From Swiss-Prot:
Keywords: Ribonucleoprotein, Ribosomal protein, RNA-binding, rRNA-binding. SMART domains: KOW (SM00739). The keyword RNA-binding applies. Part of the 50S ribosomal subunit. This is Large ribosomal subunit protein uL24. Pfam families: KOW, ribosomal_L24. GO terms for molecular function: rRNA binding; structural constituent of ribosome. GO terms for cellular component: ribonucleoprotein complex; ribosome. It comes from Malacoplasma penetrans (strain HF-2) (Mycoplasma penetrans). One of its GO terms (biological process) is translation. SUPFAM superfamilies: Translation proteins SH3-like domain. NCBIfam families: rplX_bact (TIGR01079). One of two assembly initiator proteins, it binds directly to the 5'-end of the 23S rRNA, where it nucleates assembly of the 50S subunit. One of the proteins that surrounds the polypeptide exit tunnel on the outside of the subunit.
Amino acid sequence: MQRLKKGDKVRVISGSEKGKEGIILQVFPELNTAQVEGVNVRKRHKKANQENQEGGIVDIAVPLNMSKLALIDNKAKGKTTRIKYGFDKNNKKVRISKISNSEIGSK
Protein backbone atom coordinates (compact mmCIF):
# COMPACT_ATOMS: atom_id res chain seq x y z
CA MET A 1 0.00 0.00 0.00
CA GLN A 2 1.46 3.33 -1.08
CA ARG A 3 1.78 5.86 1.77
CA LEU A 4 1.04 8.93 -0.38
CA LYS A 5 -1.76 8.77 -2.92
CA LYS A 6 -3.28 10.89 -5.67
CA GLY A 7 -5.33 13.72 -4.17
CA ASP A 8 -3.36 13.98 -0.90
CA LYS A 9 -2.29 17.46 0.20
CA VAL A 10 1.47 17.49 0.82
CA ARG A 11 4.28 19.87 1.81
CA VAL A 12 7.82 19.74 0.40
CA ILE A 13 10.25 19.26 3.31
CA SER A 14 13.63 19.58 1.56
CA GLY A 15 15.29 20.95 -1.54
CA SER A 16 14.85 24.17 -3.48
CA GLU A 17 11.04 23.89 -3.28
CA LYS A 18 11.04 23.52 0.54
CA GLY A 19 7.88 24.82 2.23
CA LYS A 20 5.65 24.75 -0.85
CA GLU A 21 2.31 22.94 -0.65
CA GLY A 22 0.19 21.25 -3.27
CA ILE A 23 -2.03 18.33 -4.18
CA ILE A 24 -0.58 15.15 -5.67
CA LEU A 25 -1.65 14.87 -9.31
CA GLN A 26 0.04 11.58 -10.17
CA VAL A 27 2.13 8.94 -8.38
CA PHE A 28 4.87 6.82 -9.98
CA PRO A 29 5.49 3.97 -7.47
CA GLU A 30 8.14 2.23 -9.57
CA LEU A 31 10.23 5.44 -9.57
CA ASN A 32 9.21 6.44 -6.01
CA THR A 33 8.17 9.88 -7.28
CA ALA A 34 5.02 12.01 -7.35
CA GLN A 35 3.87 14.95 -9.44
CA VAL A 36 2.59 17.79 -7.24
CA GLU A 37 0.42 20.66 -8.47
CA GLY A 38 2.35 23.95 -8.65
CA VAL A 39 5.59 22.50 -7.27
CA ASN A 40 8.85 21.81 -9.16
CA VAL A 41 7.56 23.52 -12.32
CA ARG A 42 9.97 23.58 -15.25
CA LYS A 43 9.77 25.28 -18.63
CA ARG A 44 9.69 23.03 -21.70
CA HIS A 45 9.90 24.11 -25.33
CA LYS A 46 7.05 22.66 -27.39
CA LYS A 47 7.25 22.35 -31.13
CA ALA A 48 4.26 23.37 -33.26
CA ASN A 49 2.24 20.43 -34.62
CA GLN A 50 -1.19 19.60 -36.08
CA GLU A 51 -2.96 19.63 -32.70
CA ASN A 52 -1.11 22.67 -31.33
CA GLN A 53 -0.67 25.20 -34.14
CA GLU A 54 1.56 27.42 -32.03
CA GLY A 55 4.70 26.15 -30.42
CA GLY A 56 6.21 27.91 -27.46
CA ILE A 57 7.39 27.60 -23.91
CA VAL A 58 5.11 25.58 -21.61
CA ASP A 59 5.26 25.13 -17.81
CA ILE A 60 5.26 21.46 -16.76
CA ALA A 61 5.26 20.02 -13.21
CA VAL A 62 8.19 17.59 -12.90
CA PRO A 63 7.87 14.67 -10.42
CA LEU A 64 9.55 14.94 -7.00
CA ASN A 65 11.01 12.11 -4.94
CA MET A 66 8.52 10.85 -2.31
CA SER A 67 11.13 11.24 0.44
CA LYS A 68 10.88 15.02 0.00
CA LEU A 69 7.10 15.07 0.63
CA ALA A 70 5.15 15.04 3.90
CA LEU A 71 1.39 14.61 4.23
CA ILE A 72 -0.54 17.57 5.68
CA ASP A 73 -3.09 16.64 8.37
CA ASN A 74 -6.05 19.07 8.29
CA LYS A 75 -7.30 17.85 11.68
CA ALA A 76 -3.94 18.77 13.26
CA LYS A 77 -4.15 22.44 12.16
CA GLY A 78 -2.19 21.88 8.95
CA LYS A 79 0.86 20.19 10.49
CA THR A 80 2.73 17.53 8.58
CA THR A 81 2.27 13.98 9.80
CA ARG A 82 3.59 10.51 9.31
CA ILE A 83 1.33 7.63 8.38
CA LYS A 84 0.62 4.34 10.09
CA TYR A 85 -1.73 1.57 9.09
CA GLY A 86 -4.68 0.03 10.87
CA PHE A 87 -7.97 -1.71 10.15
CA ASP A 88 -11.44 -0.17 10.13
CA LYS A 89 -14.69 -1.82 11.29
CA ASN A 90 -14.95 -3.83 8.06
CA ASN A 91 -11.38 -5.20 8.45
CA LYS A 92 -10.22 -3.03 5.56
CA LYS A 93 -6.66 -1.68 5.76
CA VAL A 94 -6.65 2.13 6.14
CA ARG A 95 -4.08 4.90 6.57
CA ILE A 96 -4.05 6.65 9.95
CA SER A 97 -2.41 9.97 10.90
CA LYS A 98 0.14 9.60 13.71
CA ILE A 99 -0.55 13.12 15.06
CA SER A 100 -4.36 13.21 15.23
CA ASN A 101 -4.80 9.40 15.26
CA SER A 102 -7.64 9.80 12.74
CA GLU A 103 -8.26 7.93 9.51
CA ILE A 104 -6.98 9.59 6.36
CA GLY A 105 -9.80 9.72 3.81
CA SER A 106 -9.34 7.41 0.86
CA LYS A 107 -9.46 9.20 -2.49
